[in-house]
From Swiss-Prot:
Belongs to the TFIID complex together with the TBP-associated factors (TAFs). Binds DNA as monomer. InterPro entries: TBP, TBP_CS, TBP_dom_sf, TBP_eukaryotic. This is TATA-box-binding protein. GO terms for cellular component: nucleus; transcription factor TFIIIB complex. It comes from Dictyostelium discoideum. Belongs to the TBP family. The gene is tbpA. It comes from the Eukaryota. PROSITE patterns: TFIID. The keyword Nucleus applies.
Length: 205
């Protein structure tokens, strides 16, 4: 899992009407899908393309990588493709187009249809420790907290439909969004809750 990175953007650079907390979550990963609308010979693609691997006994797709944008694609026989690793929606689309062009250059009549963002992952750091057990007790219908299995509290927000992983350190991971605004909205929704369960003394839970 990616470690949460930059969040403490100076307040004067943040539009407080959109980000009242003064914190803007960083986008860490975009997962997108596209349909190339043609059946593919995966063995031929793996042999013809650079940075491609295909082991059908392990996984029924070609795994292909490009450096710019730094992404990985899963390319299936049906012509469906999953692109992961981009840091923005535009970069994800650009990378998916690059993969489609590689397939075209290998003489497959690949098209670029039904491009969709399936998941956006963001992260941030509120810069204060959080009383996870008390937060869980107060929001049991939305949360799952089993520290012996996973150190973070899982918070399933209903609106927007985003899942948050909340760690005692104040690091937050947000996943499940289809558009970046849902990441921002989910964080602004949770920020007052996190503030209410801020650890005043790091020794006490």
């Amino acid at each position: 899992m990616s470690t949460a990175t930059t969040t403490s953007t100076p307040a004067q650079n943040v539009d407080l009407s959109k980000h009242p907390s003064g914190i803007i979550p960083t986008l860490q990963n975009i997962v997108s899908t596209v349909n190339m609308a043609t059946e593919l010979d995966l063995k031929a693609i793996a042999l013809g393309a650079r940075n491609a691997e295909y082991n059908p006994k392990r996984f029924a797709a070609v795994i292909m990588r490009i450096r710019e944008p730094k992404t990985t694609a899963l390319i299936f026989k049906s012509g469906k493709m999953v692109c992961t690793g981009a840091k923005s929606e535009d970069a994800s689309r650009f990378a998916a187009r690059k993969y489609a062009r590689i397939i075209q250059k290998l003489d497959f009549p690949a098209r670029f249809t039904d491009f969709k963002i399936q998941n956006i992952v963001g992260s941030c750091d509120v810069k204060f420790p959080i009383k996870l057990e008390l937060l869980h007790n107060a929001h049991t219908s939305f949360t799952n907290y089993e520290p012996e299995i996973f150190p973070g509290l899982i918070y399933k927000m209903i609106q927007p439909k985003v899942v948050l992983l909340i760690f005692v350190s104040g690091k937050i991971v947000l996943t499940g969004a289809k558009v970046r605004e849902e990441i921002y909205e989910a964080f602004e929704n949770i920020y007052p809750v996190l503030s209410a369960f801020k650890k005043v003394n790091a020794i006490t839970q």
